[in-house]
Amino acid sequence: MRAALAANRVQIGTWINLARNPAILTMLKSAGLDYARLDMEHSSPSIETVADMAALARALDFPLVVRPPEGNREWITRLLDVGVWGLHVPQVDTPEIAHEVAQAARYAPVGMRGMAGLGPGTDFDADLSAAARLAHLNAQVHVTVMLESAEAFRHLDEIIATPGIDAVTLGPTDLAQELGVFGTPRQAEILDEHRHRLIAAAQAHGKQAAMLVDTVEEAQRWIQAGVRIIAYSSDVAVLRSAYAAAIQRLHP
């Protein structure tokens, strides 16, 4: 993903909320997606399931991004150690939290990630020197942080400017809820204002903006606005809508 983004190629993925069989990654790659994003905050995969998916993702050369239940050192360390290289960290409200996330995600000299022995997170590679291995792993990690509150947007530039933060996004429903516009006629307008602020700030700091979309038209709109990381819908939403559309025709 880092290489594709460096080449300015749009990366289109989807959320995995329901599937637990790692073979879902093979199917998504065969469908043409560029990556998958597995949710641990609002769904229930075990750390063993995440490890299995991470192993297959790397064998397939198909990036797997994981949202942990919390953006703390413990969860970031566990995910990296089982072989996850892409993090999508929720509830990053302050520059201090962003700094803690960035420090936990990479080894010295740019961070203070907890040192682990040989394992999936290091490709079991005992041949590289310690310095070369740490530099390689640091270069693979990609960190996206989620801004989901008014406080986060008050610190927008500081969070985005944090060294080690690669991309930013917003949590639309949590943000709308906090701003008091969830389910109101103004929700779309207010969220779009925040999306445009986020994109402008990301571009100003040389970082990426990521965006969740529900339709192809939404994706096209934000790509034209400069977004290069798109999360299109989810396994749950795509399955349900496809079955519902078919059943409506079969049982008119």
Residue ranges and their predicted role:
Residues 86-100, 168-177, 227-246:
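Glycine-rich phosphate-binding active-site loops on the catalytic face of alpha/beta enzymes
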Residues 1-15, 127-139, 196-204:
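N-terminal amphipathic alpha-helix/helix-capping segment at the start of soluble metabolic enzymes
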Residues 1-64, 70-71, 103, 143, ...:
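Conserved N-terminal beta1-alpha1 strand-loop-helix module at the mouth
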Residues 74, 86-163, 174-177:
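Conserved anion-binding
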Residues 13, 36-37, 88, 169, ...:
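Conserved beta-strand positions in the central sheet of alpha/beta enzyme cores
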Residues 24-26, 30, 66, 71-85, ...:
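Catalytic cores of alpha/beta
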Residues 47-81, 103-110, 135-138, 187-210, ...:
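Alpha-helix-loop-beta-strand connector modules within alpha/beta enzyme cores
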Residues 72, 113-129, 141, 147-154, ...:
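C-terminal alpha-helical cap/extension of soluble enzyme domains
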